[in-house]
Amino acid sequence: ISEYPLYEIGKKVGSIFQDPKSQFFASITEDEIAFGCENYGVPYEELDGRVSSAIKRINGDMLRGKEIYPMSSGEKQKIAVASVNAVDPEIYVFDEPSANLDMYSVEALKNLMGGLKAEGHTIIVAEHRLYYLTDLADRFLYMENGSIKEEWTAGELLSIPEEKRRAIGIRAADLHHIEVDIPPTKEKDMTMEVKDLAFSYRKHPVFHDISFRAYAGDLIAIVGHNGIGKTTLSNILCGMQKEKEGQVIYNGTKVSKGKRKNFAYFVMQNTDCQLFGDSVEEELLLNGKGSTQEQRDDLLKLYGLFEWKERHPATLSGGQKQRLALAVSDWIDTPVLILDEPTSGLDFKNMMRISEHLKALAQKGKTILIIT
């Protein structure tokens, strides 16, 4: 492939980024799907057919004519896949494609990959979630420090001893044998109450009649299909969007949109939107004035970021950015912490690191809501 100029590689290899938004050039779905073909000079009379075929490939008729920005991450990923499919490359490269998808969408992604494979396309997937690939992938390549260390078939992957799997940081490839410990319920103080919450986007209802209570030490999962309004709900709880109807109550008092940031901190799915420092350490300094060097170093070590302290946040991997945003949330220290897909882009070791830390925060009385 090194023998080809870059513009020729783009015709042969199509990439779907971990953050699809970073590869978009248009604001409307059909325009984005057509963009690559237009740049390669595909005749206009052929272009419409390619766009329609790509939309059909992702079962995306409902996304026709829509603005891309307000879409969910799963919907944005579908548009990214369609834009690559319209160019019709020989090779597809997916970077963490399942990180932001619900189980239903992961199954749809798997079927899409299977269809492309059946047509003779080569599929390369950089992924931490493995369970949906075990009956699809021909080979699994394990990389460490920039080189391929091991190669397995699906059967060999599934037979890796649990101890070795954990040691090398690979997530479980079989979800049917994962043990879950459910701690006993204890009496707690109520931190937050949501009453009859409703929201609409440009007169289109997103959700209505949302009511629930959260208590100190609770760790609550907010689940549902992509595009159902989970992130919008979190934005409202943190004061980044305003509800159409309903109330958000913290510690027994109704709190206006502008003051909710004092009670709840939101770690976004796309952490690029909330990282502003010129280095990892400066990101902590922006949010933790008065902290000591030792405190900052200890926090960076806790999140496995100490060796990257001088790096610019933009140069970090998706998982490292997510851990940095979580470290910042420690400085802010609001009663409620909301996380949007906190384990997306993380390997097993760092996923467990985050899991243990969130459990420790809950044990100290923090209320934690996780979108997943």
Roles of regions detected by a PLM:
Residues V223-H225:
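The feature captures the beta-strand-to-loop junction immediately N-terminal to the Walker
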